[in-house]
């Protein structure tokens, strides 16, 4: 995994604006034309690569445009046995955060009524998901059967990177962590939380290992380490939540046991929705759990106004030797604003002063695709690179 040896490197969290071939790609895939879909996937990846390179992104990804939505039942039912769809009752949310305490706060009653009617994000031109009426539910022993599917997907992406002249072994490929899966995969089979989390971890282990076996860096996306805290209703104490989160971290490490640490980066944020976030758990309460995850690099939301001061945590917490911190220095929460390079540079300099310049890579708070208009998202990555260059001049001279 690359480090900022001579300058601050840049990266992002995975999801980027869809390529111009997106409509044709989806049509080909829906019609079962696998040959045409593969061609268009390659075209799309190469377009995304070009966009990243033009803006100065160092550690790139494929943009994730070809991946199914988080709650796409075909993804789960096609790759794992033991999962099915169960019709949700009238009062049953179809994901864990459906009735978080903040959504019931009278201070924000009109805000959430507006969100219910109009949605969370401005119109970004992104694909929209239909409202779910069923719960994805574990009803029996989980078993992975998607080996051939994931290998085929990874080979298509690898080939597209190769045709674009990119060394895919220095690119990252995101996958959902066990804890994040728990947001929308319910369980009617396992008797305890421990059994549930370890079953999810073991069932998804094949996906994680396939990514690394194909030569990519695995990025494990786990907003749940932070964002699940404000979803419990009634709320948990910090101590009780830490016990719940620690169990999920243990299960995550179980799933990663066969993967070298230097091929893993771990992403945490407080959820990508544009809510007030008044009930977010402070980073100081989970930073030790974060550092317990088997990974070389830790990507953390850090630029939005609710969490911009989180850099202060690193005054009292030592980043372990050999680890890399990827603070978000541009974000999705300011979806219509582009950060100035000077603001980006200042944020990076603060982190570098606390954990060491060679241990910092400039990142984004979360995926920008679908959360910002494409024009704004690409401009944010341009600002990211320009800000990293400014910080590098000041840190290296």
Over which residues does each language-model region extend?
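Domain-level signal for soluble alpha/beta catalytic cores
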Residues: 1-397
């Amino acid at each position: 995994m690359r480090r900022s040896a001579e300058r601050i490197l840049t990266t992002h969290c995975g999801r980027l604006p869809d390529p111009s071939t997106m409509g044709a790609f989806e049509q080909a895939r829906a019609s079962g034309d696998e040959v045409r879909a593969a061609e268009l996937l390659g075209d799309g990846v190469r377009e995304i690569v070009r966009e990243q390179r033009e803006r100065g992104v160092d550690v790139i990804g494929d943009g994730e445009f070809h991946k199914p939505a988080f709650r796409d039942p075909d993804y789960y039912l096609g790759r794992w046995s033991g999962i099915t769809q169960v019709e949700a009752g009238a009062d049953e949310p179809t994901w864990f955060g459906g009735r978080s305490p903040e959504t019931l706060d009278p201070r924000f009653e009109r805000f959430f009524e507006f969100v219910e009617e109009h949605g969370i994000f401005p119109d970004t031109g992104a694909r929209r998901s239909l409202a779910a009426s069923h719960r994805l539910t574990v009803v029996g022993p989980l078993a992975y059967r998607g080996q051939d599917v994931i290998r085929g997907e990874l080979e298509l992406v690898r080939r597209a990177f190769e045709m674009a002249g990119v060394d895919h072994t220095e690119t990252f490929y995101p996958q959902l962590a066990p804890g994040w899966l728990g947001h929308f995969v319910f369980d009617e089979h396992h008797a305890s939380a421990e059994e549930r989390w370890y079953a999810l971890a073991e069932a998804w282990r094949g996906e994680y290992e396939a990514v690394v076996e194909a030569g990519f860096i695995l990025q494990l996306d786990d907003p749940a380490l932070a964002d699940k805290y404000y979803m419990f209703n009634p709320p948990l104490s910090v101590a009780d939540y830490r016990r719940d989160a620690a169990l999920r971290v243990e299960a995550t490490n179980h799933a990663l046991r066969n993967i070298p640490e230097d091929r893993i980066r771990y992403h945490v944020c407080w959820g990508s929705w544009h809510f007030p976030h008044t009930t977010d758990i402070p980073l100081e309460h989970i930073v030790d759990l974060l550092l317990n995850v088997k990974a070389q690099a830790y990507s953390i939301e850090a630029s939005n106004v609710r969490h911009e001061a989180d850099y202060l945590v690193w005054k009292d917490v030592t980043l372990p030797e050999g680890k890399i911190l990827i603070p978000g220095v541009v974000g999705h929460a300011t979806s219509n604003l582009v950060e100035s390079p000077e603001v980006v540079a200042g944020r990076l300099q603060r982190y570098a002063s606390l954990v060491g310049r060679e241990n910092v890579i400039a990142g984004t708070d979360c995926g920008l695709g679908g959360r910002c208009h494409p024009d704004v998202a690409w401009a944010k990555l341009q600002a990211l690179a320009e800000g990293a260059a400014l910080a590098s001049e000041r840190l290296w001279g």
